[in-house]
Amino acid sequence: MKIYLVGGAVRDQLLNIPIKDRDYMVVGATVQEMLDKGYRQVGKDFPVFLHPKTQQEYALARTERKTGVGYGGFSVYAAPDVTLEEDLLRRDLTINAIAQDETGRVFDPYGGQADIEQRLLRHVSDAFVEDPLRVLRVARFAARFQPLGFKVAPETMALMQRIAASGELEALTPERVFQELDKALSTEAPQVFFEVLREAGGLAILFPEIEALFGIPQPEQWHPEIDTGIHTLMVLEQAARLSQDKQVRFAALVHDLGKALSPKEHLPKHHGHGQKGLPLIRALCERFRVPNDYRDLALLVSDQHQNIHNAFELRAETMVKLFDKADLWRKPERLPQLLLACEADCKGRTGLKERPYPQGAYVQHCFELARNVAIKPIIEAGFKGAEIKAQLHKQRVEVIDQYKRKTAVNAKP
């Protein structure tokens, strides 16, 4: 019985980046031997055990054979005669198919170290095409390791395109697709996930609402990049620069879906695109069972980003109605998220990524002024029932209106 550290831990160690999880592979052992040593079995589909003291995962060496459609269509063989090389052969990328024994000796039968040096994401074997989930995984690794200079090997991209053309991506469950999307959103360069998916032919299959944005023109005066799809990924890139919040990044990704619905005769203008995008966002979120907090922020950003961009021109009445509609009195934490997504939208344009976004601080200040209007004096003044709400609204509008007049005077030369 031999134990090896495998996968991401060995890869990250060779890349000199922090190791998140340590996974171990056991060669030459049976299930009973593992149980006798105090390991606790947790794997349903194949033998995976938790170490009795560290609770780290130990999996018996195994091989997999394609028996059906999708990422779950495999039969697993785990037995003491499965070798280290056979187990590593089933893995997706060479950089993930490196092992290290307990003495620190590295085993690299498929050239993973050379690919780390060349910054290449390359498949281990042609069995790569048997698992459609790997298209998403490679796109995610491309996003994660883009800051280190990694690229997808051309021959691996060809296999990803083959998987997309085969129709197997449709066999992926919504939960697994969102799981990969969510992990991609947490990387430093989430836009790369979608760029790689698009090159592989998977974007049109899994995220047709985003694919539809490519080729849709915008006014060059406001959007030097012109193409809405390019703008969308630039906005996502800026959202990642501005915030670690995955909800903000998701909202940035889908904020302009409505532009794909603009009538051709109106292009490159997109009147009401924020509202047109709302049903598309709802459908996408329902399809992938996106968490409600992601969905709600995305809907808010799509609906209100034009108003936030035009904040200095908004009437105080409109501003308070925006706060009402966004339910910010009960959920004030939503406002910074909304403003960050809008700032990313402003900066996600060619040549404008360093442009200031004073609308953010302005709207936040207006909200704080309105939120500080006290309800107690209104009640003490004798207002009752619906009158209280009306008076509260009136005073909120007045306090913002005073601030608007004051800032307008101060802004004059």
Curated annotation (Swiss-Prot):
It comes from Shewanella loihica (strain ATCC BAA-1088 / PV-4). Magnesium is required for nucleotidyltransferase activity. Nickel for phosphatase activity. Catalyzes the addition and repair of the essential 3'-terminal CCA sequence in tRNAs without using a nucleic acid template. Adds these three nucleotides in the order of C, C, and A to the tRNA nucleotide-73, using CTP and ATP as substrates and producing inorganic pyrophosphate. tRNA 3'-terminal CCA addition is required both for tRNA processing and repair. Also involved in tRNA surveillance by mediating tandem CCA addition to generate a CCACCA at the 3' terminus of unstable tRNAs. While stable tRNAs receive only 3'-terminal CCA, unstable tRNAs are marked with CCACCA and rapidly degraded. Monomer. Can also form homodimers and oligomers. It comes from the Bacteria. Keywords: ATP-binding, Hydrolase, Magnesium, Metal-binding, Multifunctional enzyme, Nickel, Nucleotide-binding, Nucleotidyltransferase, RNA repair, RNA-binding, Transferase, tRNA processing. ATP binds at G8, R11, R91, R137, R140. This is Multifunctional CCA protein. InterPro entries: CCA_bact, HD/PDEase_dom, HD_domain, NT_sf, PolA_pol_head_dom, PolyA_RNA-bd, tRNA_CCA-adding_enzyme. Its EC number is 2.7.7.72, 3.1.3.-, 3.1.4.-. Residues 228-329 form the HD domain. One of its GO terms (molecular function) is phosphatase activity. Transmembrane segments: none annotated.
